[in-house]
């Protein structure tokens, strides 16, 4: 938490009141007594969340504690459950080996009562109300301070449908009451069914505006079929189906304006996010440029998120009631074992389709035991394009020209067309050259001097000569990036997001650059912004090619 009084971040811990049977949040310096009964409290862990009756029923089945948890005070830490303050662990092997169909059948006959749950939650809110008031006050102040210089029309909320963005949105809407702030929902097309239901409920609220950002030019399964399923090391889905789509929507809504975006990012949620700052201005720390990113709940933990939601009776995503700790793409390679089990139980048709796809993929790349490869989650740690035909698209094949200095002959996997020549617009003006060899020349954007000669040799081979430049090697390196784009582009939208002038268009027909909008900044051809010139290099290069 961020302390207003001490103006610094303070570490909090979760304590347990044995008398009231609820968790209480405290810093090391605060008194270790329950504010309800005044009894001493005992340190439990660093963070917990409430376990709803639907999840309790599942835990009873998995832990062989039939009927023992419904009237208990049940909470969950990162891995461990706590029942009336005592730890209960469910081994990962139990989750992996669990029979989803048997569990589903048992859950059908369960009845859920919220009586004891509501009683425990009421005490949880009462025992922690002063803490909630403090963090809410601090968050509101932060939001007001950060938004002072921005117009209402230049402020947005990045909304995922998860608990963190739900709390962030509520804090922002309350702090900026009277203003209608746009909520941009990045629909990856892989959201949980209950997330879509939640978004539909929110659309009925006239006080907020939900804008859906979706990449309609691409299909997840078709792309996964070409470049393999996403993995922890190869999360191509994030940019293709979320960041790129959101960036495209933001460009339509805000143009080149510098905007303020409120995100539901928390420092303790992951190692990656722990390296972020609460307020980000530097482009290298943001997935989407031209915005100031602010995170009101940056110092909050999960305990505080749920305290805010339940105390303020905010509508939230029902997926959390089932046992999800995080709600995002239901088939995410970063999903926990419990999340995968929940998908098998509650989204069985979609899960079966995904499972069959993964098994087929394992067979195609030559895995000896494809079913086991999927069961143990080995696909989640795969890297590169081993076994995939598309891997050849990022393999640059060229040779030095023996008859022309500074010339190289490049082999292509896609035929030469008009869009191929447009890939050279970032280097300068593309004009017709010697018509007898179908040459195109690229004139330097400043001097007007020819710097590149493009000479098609056949449909799949081109000779490119660099002219009148000091560093021919650097220019050929950047040219090779455009060659790889031509061969490998899968419409991931990364290049669209890199271009600050909206000159790049990516659609079902491919990659195109508008010569009237391009400012020749060459960010789109630089490895600084796009490693290897195309994100597919990261996802499809094999170990041999990466050396």
Where are these regions (language model features)?
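Nucleotide-activated chemistry modules centered on ATP-dependent adenylation/adenylyltransferase
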Residues: 1-158, 163-483, 505-511, 516-519, ...
């Amino acid at each position: 938490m961020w302390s207003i009084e001490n103006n610094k971040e303070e570490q909090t811990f979760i304590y347990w009141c044995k008398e009231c049977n609820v968790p209480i949040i405290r810093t090391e310096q605060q008194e270790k007594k329950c504010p309800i009964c005044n009894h001493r409290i005992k340190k439990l862990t660093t963070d917990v969340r409430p376990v709803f009756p639907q999840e309790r029923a599942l835990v009873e089945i998995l832990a062989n504690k039939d009927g023992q948890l419904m009237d208990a005070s049940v909470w969950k830490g990162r891995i461990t459950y706590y029942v009336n303050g005592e730890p209960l662990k469910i081994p990962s092997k139990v989750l992996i080996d669990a029979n989803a169909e048997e569990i589903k059948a048992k859950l059908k006959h369960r009845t859920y009562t919220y009586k004891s749950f509501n009683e425990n939650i009421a005490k949880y809110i009462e025992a922690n109300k002063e803490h909630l008031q403090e963090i809410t006050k601090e968050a509101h102040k932060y939001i007001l301070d950060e938004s002072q210089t921005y117009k209402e029309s230049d402020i947005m909320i990045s909304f995922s449908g998860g608990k963190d963005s739900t709390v962030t949105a509520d804090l922002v809407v309350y702090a900026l009451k009277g203003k209608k702030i746009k909520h941009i929902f990045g629909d990856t097309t892989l959201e949980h069914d209950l997330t879509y239901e939640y978004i539909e409920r929110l659309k009925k609220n006239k006080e907020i505006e939900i804008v859906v950002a979706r990449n309609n030019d691409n299909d997840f399964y078709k792309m996964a079929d070409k470049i393999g399923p996403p993995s922890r090391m190869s999360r191509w889905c994030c940019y293709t189906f979320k960041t790129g789509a959101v960036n495209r929507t933001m460009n339509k809504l805000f143009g080149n304006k510098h905007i303020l975006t409120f995100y539901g990012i928390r420092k303790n949620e992951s190692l990656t996010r722990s390296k972020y700052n609460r307020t980000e201005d530097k482009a290298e720390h943001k997935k989407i440029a031209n915005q100031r990113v602010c995170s009101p709940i940056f110092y909050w933990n999960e305990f505080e998120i749920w305290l805010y939601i339940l105390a303020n009776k905010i509508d939230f995503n029902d997926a959390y009631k089932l046992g999800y700790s995080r709600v995002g793409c239901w088939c995410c390679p970063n999903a926990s074992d419990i999340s995968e089990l929940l998908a098998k139980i509650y989204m069985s048709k979609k899960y079966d389709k995904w499972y069959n796809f993964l098994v087929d993929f394992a067979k195609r790349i030559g895995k000896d035991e494809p079913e086991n490869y999927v069961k143990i989650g080995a696909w989640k740690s795969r890297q590169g394009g081993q076994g995939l035909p598309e891997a050849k698209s990022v393999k640059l094949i060229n040779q030095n020209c023996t008859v022309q200095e500074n010339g190289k002959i490049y082999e292509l996997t896609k035929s030469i067309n008009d869009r191929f020549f447009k890939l050279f617009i970032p280097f300068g003006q593309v004009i017709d050259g010697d018509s007898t060899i179908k040459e195109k020349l690229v004139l330097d954007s400043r001097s007007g001097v020819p710097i590149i000669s493009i000479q098609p040799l056949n449909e799949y081979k081109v000779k490119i000569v660099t002219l009148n430049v000091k560093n021919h090697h650097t220019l050929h390196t950047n040219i090779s990036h455009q060659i790889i784009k031509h061969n490998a582009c899968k419409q991931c939208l990364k290049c669209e997001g890199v271009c600050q002038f909206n000159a790049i268009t990516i659609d079902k027909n491919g990659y195109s650059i508008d010569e009237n909008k391009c400012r020749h900044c060459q960010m789109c051809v630089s490895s600084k912004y796009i490693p290897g010139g195309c994100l597919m290099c990261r996802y499809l290069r094999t170990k041999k090619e990466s050396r």
